[in-house]
Each structure stands twice: as structure tokens, then as C-alpha cells.
Amino acid sequence: MKKVCIVGASGFTGGELLRILLQHRGVEIVCATSRRFKGEYVYRVHPNLRGFTQLKFVEPSIDVALKADVVFLALPHGESVKWVPKLYESGVAVFDLSADFRLKDPNAYVEWYKWPQPHPYPDLLQKAVYGQPELHRDELVGAKLVAVPGCMATASILMLAPLAKFGLLSDTPPVVDAKIGSSGAGAEGSVVDLHSFRTYVVRPYEPVHHRHIAEIEQELTRLAGRKVRIAFTPHAVDIVRGIFTTGHVYVEKLPSETDMWRYYRALYGDSKFIRIVKDRLGISRYPNVKYVLGTNIVDLGFELDPRLNRVVTFAAIDNLVRGAAGQAVQAFNIAMGFPEDEGLRQIPIAPL
């Protein structure tokens, strides 16, 4: 039984960590922290957990976190870096859901996250494992510092990884169009995330320099064995949960459909969570966010365009589960020797 502390447990991601870990048979949650709600019952902030826990929020501190064997950090970008060195030095396993340890290049934090100086702990950047289980499974075994990928990066990387791995990416950068629900803005959000502004919206934001580009390019470069650049534009849309990405990859030689199935199965054939959706019949012939909500499932698909030598790829995930808390727990399971799907065996709800 692993004793777990969730630091920053009052937000959407923290709430999902609580929901998942309360169902995990190998975990005891010993603390859930929140400055704003310290002393309050967890279920009063996360009403869906009523009747499942009597935990109360406590003031966050290193000393509190050190009571656990494992700490999940669900903190804003730029905050985890203040916690990780002390926790890591103390021997506690850390699963960081912020971006603070995702990028291997210390200087990248100046460009992509507007830090005033390069990352202060370059040694820890190299020790951190990028927590995408299908692509880093061996590295995750026994890992003590895991950087959980970003939500839109998760969908984009898994969607394009087979093409990068098997040499289909040309010198023309892939174009990725992403759509994300309002929960991606967090529990506090901004004025444009209020219902009256968000309803009916399809709105681009950070259309040419979104920070998730850095980790997408980092991972695709690793898989391809050469520098990969992408064009990436996200859109806020009128749903609460979910991310849908469409990739346009212009190739020198169009693969056959049989080849595409072979590439996807070679990379993901053993995955408990990835489904390849490309059906000739049925009501959902390609990936659809609607059929992954509340789960750690990734639905991937593709189509071929011989007119333009274009491979069109698709990915659908729940941004709060596979894009954050669920992927963190999946990585935790591998690192700690639990079954990979422990706590994550939810079947999607339909209709919804």
C-alpha cells in the first residue's frame, strides 16, 4: 500500500486525482492540500466525492508532503519547481502534472514559458521521465521523478507518433488543429471562460506559439531521430471536457491503409488504453470525444488523401483524465509495479 499526497487538490485536476486514487486498491491518500480550502471537507469542493471520503484539505507544506511515499503535484506552472528538489532529495517519488520538468532543454523555459532565466535544475530535467506510458514504458519502471505530459501535447504526440517512428514525416511540418473544452482553463479560469462567453464558441487562442509545441516537437524529434517542427493551433470550444486533434501530414510517398494499420498496431498493439477507430459501419466511424469522456482511453484514427499525398490523423481524449490525472496514475502504476490499469478501468458513459 502506497501512501499518497496530492498537492493542489482543489482544482479540476486535483479532483480527478482524488476520484481515481480513491478507487485504487494499492493507495492510501494521506493528505490533500489546498491553501484556500484548508480545514474544509474535500467533498464540499468536489461534490461528486460525497460519501466516498471524509478527507479534509490541509495547508500545503513540504513537511506534510513528506508523510507520503508518493506525491502528486497538481500545481500551476512555475510552482512545482519550488517543491520537486526537496521532495526528490528526500526519496519521495514525485509525479508532477505541471510543465516544470517536461522539457529537457533548460533554455526552452525562457522561450516557451517566459521564465526570466533558464531552468535552475538542469540535472533534474535530465533525470525526469516524460510520463507518456506508451512511449516511455521502460523508463517509467522504478522512476522517482515523472513529468506528466500536457493535455493537448498528449493527444498530438500519440496521434503523430507512428508516423514519426516509421519515417513518414517529411520536411513539411505537420499541421495540428486542436479543440479543447472549458475545463482546460482550470477551475478558476478567466472572464472568457464564463458561461455567457464560452457558450457557442469556437475560438482560436495562441494560434502560432502555444507552449505545448515545445514538448510535441521534443517527443516527435526523439521518435523520428531528426529535428521535427510542427504547426499547431488550438481552439476553445463549447464543451466542458475533451480534446480533439486533427493532424495533416504531407508525405513524399503515401502509405497504404494496410501499412498505416501496421504502424499503429506496432506502436500501440499492447496498450490497454489506445483504441484505433476506423470503421466502415456504425455511428462513430472515426474518433469522437463523446466516447472517451471520464476515462483514460485514447481513440486514434486516420484517413488517406491520395490527391494531395496527405495522411489525416485524429485523436480524442478526456483532457482531465488521459490529459492529466489518468495519465499520471497510469505512469504511477508502471513506476510502482501495479497493474497498468489499476484505478483506471472505467468504461465511457453513453449517451451523454
From Swiss-Prot:
Top EC class for this record: oxidoreductase
Protein name in the entry: Putative [LysW]-L-2-aminoadipate/[LysW]-L-glutamate phosphate reductase
Keywords: Amino-acid biosynthesis, Arginine biosynthesis, Cytoplasm, Lysine biosynthesis, NADP, Oxidoreductase
GO molecular function, one term: NADP+ binding
Pathway where this protein functions: Amino-acid biosynthesis; L-lysine biosynthesis via AAA pathway; L-lysine from L-alpha-aminoadipate (Thermus route): step 3/5; Amino-acid biosynthesis; L-arginine biosynthesis
Catalytic residues (UniProt): 151
Gene name for this UniProt entry: lysY
Gene3D superfamilies in the record: Dihydrodipicolinate Reductase, domain 2, NAD(P)-binding Rossmann-like Domain
Any one of the GO CC terms: cytoplasm
